[in-house]
Amino acid sequence: MLFVGSNYPFAEVMFKPNVKFIQIDNNPQVLGKRHKTDVAILADAKKSLQRFIELGEDSQPSAWYAANVDNVANWNQYNDDMMNRTDSDLRFEPAFKEINRISEDDAIYSIDVGDVTQNAVRLLKVNGKQPWITSGLFATMGVGLPGSIAAKLSYPNRQVFNLAGDGAAAMVMQDLSTQVAYHLPVINVVFSNDALGFIEDEQEDDNHEWFGISLPQTDFAKVAEGQGMTGITVDKFDQMKPAFDKAVELTKAGKPVLIDIKITNERPIPVEKLILDADKYDQKTIDDFKKRYYAEKLVPLSDYLKKHNVQ
């Protein structure tokens, strides 16, 4: 495992425990922080990788790699289709399409904890100049708003987003007034599904009865207005683009804004258990899964492995 300039918080629990771990970083304090290192290299990441390329040997094309390229392309197409879908109730994906559309080349994303975290990972079209921050290992709900304040204070000339679910937003919404008081033009986006969605997902996975997950419907646009910033409610597809255009206009004028998007409480597709493979599941179970998650065009990895003759 080559761990380059990363602070990925789940390295200890998600990587194989016996994997050879090589870490490159220019900060000595983080070497070995997330995982025991076999080789720790204190150096510039870019220069190190360039040197690795010079010293390394070209690898031969492999069927395994080709199968995974096809698999990733299929997954990306699924996400793109969901962001463009307008024939269902309002979901979170079209909002991310708008966020991607208006994002500046060096935008900063402060991502809260919950379904919004995994949705951001899947749907934000980030480039190498667009950092995003969250509370990974501790999963501290409510981190999005203070993170956006810190980002805007640190980088006043860069576009900053706060992306949060309604559960997290309700915990810290009083600090919208801090953005107003200090003239911090942040684009706040609240995904309101009237539930602690990620906890609901976990309870479903563990076969628990629903407990403690329902949230009262909150008018976050009115909350924002009450604290001195413009609040916009979106509950229809055709309201999405004008809302984000208005957000750009306001923040360019030096004013923060909040967009409250009223979405369905439909679960994001659980990639840890994709029920697609006919060799593992019966057809009805597969059909039910595809219908629930609009995954008619998703193909199991096993199909691509067969296509490329991977044994």
Task: Tell me the role of every PLM-derived stretch.
Residues 31-39, 130-134, 171, 200-212, ...:
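Short beta-alpha connecting loops at secondary-structure transitions
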Residues 48, 58, 203-245:
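Conserved thiamine diphosphate
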Residues 1, 6-9, 118-196:
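Thiamine diphosphate
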Residues 72-146, 151:
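Active-site diphosphate/adenylate-binding microenvironment
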Residues 12, 246-311:
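Glycine/aspartate-rich loop-and-adjacent alpha/beta segment that forms the canonical ThDP
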Residues 113-117, 193-195, 262-267:
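Glycine-rich beta-alpha junction loops
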Residues 11-30, 129-130, 271-285:
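A short, gly/pro- and small-residue-rich
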Residues 1-67, 203, 244-247:
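Glycine-rich, acidic loop regions that bind phosphate or pyrophosphate groups
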